Amino acid sequence: MNTAVFLNIHANTYARFAHIRTQLMQGSKDSQANALGSVLSEMACEVIEQVFIVLLQENQHYSQTGESEKVIQQILEAVRKYMPWSVSFFSNDRLVPLVEYLSKTLQIEDETIYMTYPIDQKLAQRVETSSQKLAAGDQQEISNALRLLTEVIDVGVTHLIREPKKCLKFNFVVDKTLNGVITMTTHLGYKRLEKLGTQLDHQVASTYIDYFLKFMRHQA
């Protein structure tokens, strides 16, 4: 049995991506780089807002400083700045491998579009076990639960950002810049989740873990 994470993508965002893919497959002479960079940044932001929604919830209910919201905004701003910039370098033919890679991560079910990535079955089981412990009132499980979710999220970063980035075969300078941006943004999110492990009670933590479990599906 395989397990995958399914994250919603807005229909209009997907429609833009599909149009760009069609243009590339038909050999359009019009550059698709700027349009693709824009739509990929929107897709990334939609995914980020879903997986880090606990930070926004925490900000609303617990934090008076807006610290979590600032973290989210820093991440989103970096994505919107660097993703279009990174794609803008390339001609249409160089974009095709990236678009084909990402198209394979997308699934449509009942007119709902998902971006998906696989996770190890053992990791999925550990998340489920952690959820059960939280539901039983185990306050000591909070930090471990959020650490496990960080692992699940980072698998997604690998499948949806690190691996497809290789399709573009950046030069050393650009690749190093992008790796730095990826490291910085993920570190911001992960450190904030880690800090929440010392601040949330088990009921709030359990709610978020259960929310994230809804993204995880077991497939034959």
Model-derived features with residue positions:
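Protein-protein interaction and targeting regions used for scaffolding, dimerization, and localization
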Residues: 1-220
